[in-house]
């Protein structure tokens, strides 16, 4: 499918069934925010279960560059010595956020109000992703941000300045846009308000409240009071529902499967994928429901199910935006047709995820009609042909989704350019193989 150098190539093949218990990778969104708010708080923040993927490590490096002491105590355990809202120092180098759109957009908001100059950049993929959606509202607050294409593309040069509070009606439901404005509002006197067309994930609000900020939430509206007194916290990061979605779908589509996924974050702004899979007839049960650090958590038991095609309600899209690539796999192996609509945001992720999944699954024998805002997928419960080499477009979620599809292919599948799996799920192959996957790294052979 691609003449581009294949990079890390992984083979995936059919398996009899999946069984066992795993804890998926730690939540990436919460890990990023733990570092950010730990740095801005007074005193020490102790984090357990931090995701040590490349995206979060970039955030840690950025704050170390700005003078914050962040000590790695053990695997996933960090101590952050917060210096308060005005304690960051001007970085002596460009802040390279790698592949992380979350880190770049959130830091854009934070750095806009700092009394120094900074530059944010990233890899080729990140430099092609839209940044105007955060630059525009920040500019309304008085931010001075310059970038390519009129400030719409990174690298971004930020000349920190005193900001003014605003009320911003966001045209899209995006936690990254909302969080960038909230972070700018932290260092801004008065109340900053964001109104969204639908509720986006709320990890920023939950964590800020835990750190001591005054945050008011009313439906789709969030207001932050500037200059809060943030205090260091003890944080335990749950498993990421976005990471759990891969073994979840794998078990649902593989006959005889019965697995348990431990300690998965059940934040209601993130459980859209559960709603979609349950609507298809998925056998997913929540066990041991509890709350950890202000976030709902549960263990999930997932069993093979004869899935049925559904029509997506566009209002669920913001709550499942990162899980749609693997949802496409579930739809391709369901009975009947599935219509994905209202998901045009997928086109401006690490790749154009609609085209990437449509091309990849069609190469494996699936029937997919691409639409501007989604796709019409005609499922085949008997499985796919496979026997192809497909491109992940260096997108971690595309790579993992196509590897899941390989479980139900008659011939094994080669997925190219899988290197970026390390951004969100470094232990993916090891954990999936422990459940019964047949993943093999064939990069050198």
From Swiss-Prot:
Top-rank taxon: Bacteria
CDD domains assigned to the protein according to its UniProt record, in alphabetical order: EPSP_synthase
Chief location: cytoplasm
Binding site for 3-phosphoshikimate: 28-29, 33, 174, 176, 322, 349
Cellular component, GO, one term: cytoplasm
Top EC group: transferase
Keywords assigned: Amino-acid biosynthesis, Aromatic amino acid biosynthesis, Cytoplasm, Transferase
BP terms from Gene Ontology: amino acid biosynthetic process; aromatic amino acid family biosynthetic process; chorismate biosynthetic process
Its EC number(s): 2.5.1.19
UniProt entry tagged with the keyword Transferase: yes
Family: Belongs to the EPSP synthase family.
Subunit structure: Monomer.
Protein name per its UniProtKB record: 3-phosphoshikimate 1-carboxyvinyltransferase
Organism of derivation: Magnetococcus marinus (strain ATCC BAA-1437 / JCM 17883 / MC-1)
């Amino acid at each position: 499918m691609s003449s581009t150098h294949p990079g890390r190539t992984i083979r995936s093949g059919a398996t009899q069934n999946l069984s066992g218990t795993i804890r998926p990778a730690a939540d990436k969104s919460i890990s990023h925010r733990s570092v950010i708010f730990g740095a801005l708080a007074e005193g020490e923040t102790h984090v357990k279960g931090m995701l040590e993927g490349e995206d979060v490590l970039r955030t840690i490096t950025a704050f170390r560059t700005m003078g914050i002491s962040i000590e790695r105590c053990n695997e996933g355990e960090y101590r952050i010595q917060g210096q308060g809202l005005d304690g960051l120092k001007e970085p002596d180098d460009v802040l390279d956020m790698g592949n992380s759109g979350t880190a770049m957009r959130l830091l854009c908001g934070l750095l806009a109000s700092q009394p120094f100059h900074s530059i944010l950049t990233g890899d080729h993929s990140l430099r092609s992703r839209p940044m105007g959606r955060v630059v525009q509202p920040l500019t309304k607050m008085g931010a001075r941000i310059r970038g390519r294409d009129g400030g719409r593309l990174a690298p971004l040069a930020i000349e920190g300045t005193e900001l003014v509070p605003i009320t911003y009606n966001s045209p899209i439901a995006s936690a990254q846009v909302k969080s960038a404005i909230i972070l700018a509002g932290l260092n801004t006197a008065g109340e900053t308000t964001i109104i969204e067309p639908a509720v986006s994930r709320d990890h920023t609000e939950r964590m800020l409240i835990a750190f001591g900020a005054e945050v008011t939430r009313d439906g789709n509206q969030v207001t932050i009071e500037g200059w809060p007194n943030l205090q260091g916290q003890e944080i335990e990061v749950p498993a990421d529902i976005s990471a759990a979605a891969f073994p979840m779908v794998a078990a649902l589509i593989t006959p005889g499967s019965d697995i348990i996924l431990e300690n998965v974050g059940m934040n209601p702004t993130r459980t859209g994928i559960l709603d979609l899979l349950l609507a298809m007839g998925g056998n997913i049960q929540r066990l041991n429901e509890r709350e950890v650090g202000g976030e709902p958590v549960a263990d999930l038991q997932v069993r093979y199910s004869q899935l049925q095609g559904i029509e997506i309600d566009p209002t669920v899209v913001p709550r499942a935006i990162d899980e749609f690539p693997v949802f496409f796999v579930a739809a391709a192996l369901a009975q009947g047709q599935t219509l994905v609509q209202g998901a045009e945001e997928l086109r401006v992720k690490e790749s154009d995820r609609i085209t990437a999944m449509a091309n990849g699954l069609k190469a494996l024998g699936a029937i997919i009609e691409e639409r501007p805002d989604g796709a019409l997928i005609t499922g085949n419960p008997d499985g796919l042909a496979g026997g192809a080499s497909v491109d992940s477009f260096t997108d971690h979620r595309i790579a993992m989704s196509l590897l899941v599809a390989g479980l139900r292919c008659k011939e094994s599948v080669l997925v190219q350019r899988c290197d970026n799996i390390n951004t969100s799920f470094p232990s993916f192959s090891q954990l999936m193989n422990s459940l019964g996957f047949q993943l093999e790294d064939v990069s050198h052979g």
